[in-house]
């Protein structure tokens, strides 16, 4: 039986300076969950590690929805099968509750891609940023790259800048390589393979009234 990654939306950024990571609240599998209701469109599960959370998994399309104890929608998105697992694929949205969007963006096989946006509880845009595939040595990585903006709740621009992807020389990856003598696969540690986001070019910072308070040229 395929395992389900039943969790709150992942928003793991690789940026520096404004680094922030929102980690999953709950991981579990279909085998460990209790089916509380089954409908023509899918099944509702009670997450075993948090009885206050209920997960809906639809079959066609492969939908994922997470509800709190009051049946308020917290997260929704689409999934794609990958062997014995399901991956985030397509649009994913996290909510404050009562339909108020907190974070919205797209995934490609569990990797954030394209434009992502965060919102205040009032519905005003908080920030906008972009993820792009960065290839290094034939391996695609996903990193924040491109324009970046933050806003005050009154709509005034707070930060305006640009990120570029650079190779992090301190990063390490484990890859499988074939031993030419034995033909057996073995693990090898490869250094300096992963990209990270780095501020680039002009960065501008504004007060809530719109006054330019700081400018950098990186």
Regions found by a protein language model. Name each.
Residues 1-25:
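Bacterial Sec-dependent N-terminal signal peptides
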Residues 19-218:
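Glycine/tyrosine- and acidic-biased, solvent-exposed loop/turn segments at the edges of beta-strands
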